[in-house]
């Protein structure tokens, strides 16, 4: 497979070695062998995967358009109408791509895939809710809730006990003040709890919508015959070498 200019097609393989990051990666890897860098980007330009491989490791047969690996470890599929080097893909690679891009169709030929989406458990969101600021906010709110809840309960109970004692000594003004303080305290606590809970519920709903486990439902007829493609590729290479010799 030869590399060309950067195409930036959504869901396609983008060969781009111009940035400093790629040059650094190439220098740190196997310096003695020619290499190429491929990228998979989303619609908004977000980098979803980067593959740096030596040219000598390429397979003569069909390869996955996402990871550039052959069909030795996992069989290749042709689930859409794309042809050529973009027509074959690993099932697991395509599932990760659909999950990351939050789509259910091919970005190139717009073929709709039959997929089953399963939401991830809430425990995964608690472990990794997303960006760093969201992690910090969730942690701080949980700590504040654990401290403020017993503090508000004890403060309210003490205020009510004080109001009861003042009523016994006919100090109605102090009793009314303590009751009003208790009501204000619990009102602020309930409002803060509801606002924080609603905010984190919205974050969780968005995370659950964009971080689903995608299962690709592919019929057997869509399986790419890897052996057949390998034999066909070998025949083409052999015929090309014969023509070159002649």
From Swiss-Prot:
One of its GO terms (cellular component) is endoplasmic reticulum membrane. Its EC number is 2.3.2.27. It catalyses: S-ubiquitinyl-[E2 ubiquitin-conjugating enzyme]-L-cysteine + [acceptor protein]-L-lysine = [E2 ubiquitin-conjugating enzyme]-L-cysteine + N(6)-ubiquitinyl-[acceptor protein]-L-lysine. PROSITE patterns: ZF_RING_CH (PS51292). Zn(2+) 2 binds at residues 80, 82, 106, 109. A zinc finger (RING-CH-type) spans 56-116. This is E3 ubiquitin-protein ligase MARCHF2. It comes from Xenopus tropicalis (Western clawed frog).
